């Protein structure tokens, strides 16, 4: 009987040890599926090429939002299927064709493995389906989708050779160039592949502020993120946010903030409510906020504020680009995000807390911040 308390203490100690081990095991498993899943990529290196290729495709789909995570890619694919299976199919075709073209052109294998040779064609495939005037399941569209997807690695390689002189990424410039080229060549009145008609605003929009819906504004936040892929379903946008969250909570936070700032910018310019609800004011600013807020600049309070400024600037610049592009009957796409973010990345400052990441070291926000802090520590310890 005297030994009973001792036995209880031992049992409690064992339970605490098992609980700690369980938590550590849980964190370890979570570490394998979050971030850029580097361990999984290393594990795949000696596996069949088919498995590696599937990983590259899924990473390409997720790289549109700066995420290199195959599970995030699966979630984004699910979101696309919720929105429209035909759009999802065209996006997958574009990603596959672009990745294969990059392999044939002997592009950098590490970039291909990270999905960097697929994401532009993902957008090309989806947006060609979105802007097609033939509706869903117009199977002949697969041919121009494949053809334009082949141009993406060419555009990427050419732009990279120029922008690499300043250590800058190509972003979605290849997508903008490929889609603009296709829509310019076909247009609304093409017999085979007619597209939607884009026209400049020709009258003052009828806006009644009392009709502004708080619920619709709330829904426009995930819709703004969804419009990065051309999707207007709030559930799809929510799935995309979950996909980003899995890889990087900081990137997810900035994606949501960027979409919110786009809504604020739209309201400040008295934009038609339908455009705001449709997410057209949120997607460019969302991308810009992610890019500056921890992706290509190490996250500090200074760069966080800079990301907010860049998001607002991008939203206003997006309105400018929409008006200009409509004159030549083209959509604004993500031109404003690319140009505005490149402008902010070229910013020079003597503030050590505004640190632009070397392009070769960019991974995801949390890892980028660790690199920045380690580099800062080394500079303090050995200033020479």
Curated annotation (Swiss-Prot):
Keywords: Cell membrane, Glycoprotein, Membrane, Phosphoprotein, Transmembrane, Transmembrane helix, Transport. Glycans are attached at residue 206. Disruption phenotype: Mutant mice exhibit grossly normal appearance, activity and behavior. Plasma sodium, potassium, chloride, bicarbonate and creatinine concentrations, as well as hematocrit, are similar to wild type animals. Urea permeability in erythrocytes is 45-fold lower than that from wild-type mice. Daily urine output is 1.5-fold greater and urine osmolarity is lower than in wild-type mice. After 24 hours of water deprivation, plasma urea concentration is 30% higher and urine urea concentration 35% lower in mutant mice than in wild-type animals. It comes from the Eukaryota. Induction: Down-regulated by water deprivation in urinary bladder and ureter, but not in kidney medulla, colon, testis nor brain. GO terms for cellular component: basolateral plasma membrane; membrane; plasma membrane. It is found in: Cell membrane; Basolateral cell membrane. InterPro entries: Ammonium/urea_transptr (IPR029020), Urea_transporter (IPR004937). The chain crosses the membrane at residues 61-81, 85-105, 111-131, 138-158, 168-188, 250-270, 276-296, 305-325, 327-347. GO terms for molecular function: urea channel activity; urea transmembrane transporter activity; water transmembrane transporter activity. Expressed in brain, kidney, heart, liver, lung, skeletal muscle, spleen, testis, ureter and urinary bladder (at protein level). Along the gastrointestinal tract, detected in colon, jejunum and stomach (at protein level). In the kidney, expressed in some microvessels of the inner and outer medulla, but not all (at protein level). Not detected in the cortex (at protein level). Detected in the urothelium all along the urinary tract, including the papilla surface, the ureter, the bladder and the urethra (at protein level). It is a multi-pass membrane protein. GO terms for biological process: establishment of localization in cell; urea transmembrane transport; urea transport; water transport. Signal peptide: none annotated. The record marks 334 as: Important for channel permeability. It holds the Pfam family UT. It catalyses: urea(in) = urea(out). Homotrimer; each subunit contains a pore through which urea permeates. Identified in a complex with STOM. Mediates the transport of urea driven by a concentration gradient across the cell membranes of erythrocytes and the renal inner medullary collecting duct which is critical to the urinary concentrating mechanism. Facilitates water transport in erythrocytes. PANTHER family: UREA TRANSPORTER, UREA TRANSPORTER 1. This is Urea transporter 1. It comes from Mus musculus (Mouse).
